[in-house]
């Protein structure tokens, strides 16, 4: 059975790179959204349909809603919403900023000087074993 993941990221390049790493570890169905509001809507829809997400992966700096500018607080805002409304859903922060969020399942610094791919793989493997 495929791991169902929602990925909140406004960069197509980062989305492709992260998806490639995920699919090297688990069979995954990855839904990609580029803003917080659309992500929350998709999470609600998935729950209503009886097919909730197994994991959310979020950037830190992207739009809060469609057609808006990127917001540096978007990732933290998303993690807060998930903690309040969807506590069952683990969140991995994967950002070009080396930021830690204590409410996230894990944080990955997306940077070429860091083994971000190995870090993400390890988090996915650990979560898949649960």
Regions found by a protein language model. Name each.
Residues 53-86:
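Conserved phosphotransfer microenvironments
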Residues 25-26, 50, 86:
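A structural signal for short coil/turn segments at secondary-structure junctions
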Residues 32-55, 59, 63-64:
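Acidic, metal-coordinating helix/loop segments flanking the phosphotransfer/catalytic sites
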Residues 77-101, 106-108:
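A short, hydrophobic beta-strand element within the central beta-sheet of small alpha/beta folds
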Residues 97, 116-130:
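Receiver (REC) domain switch/output surface
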Residues 5, 30, 91-92:
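Hydrophobic/aromatic residues located in beta-strands of well-ordered beta-sheets
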Residues 11-15, 61-67, 97-100:
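Short acidic, S/G/P-rich loop/turn micro-motifs used as interaction or catalytic elements
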Residues 2-14, 18-22:
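Conserved acidic segment of CheY-like receiver
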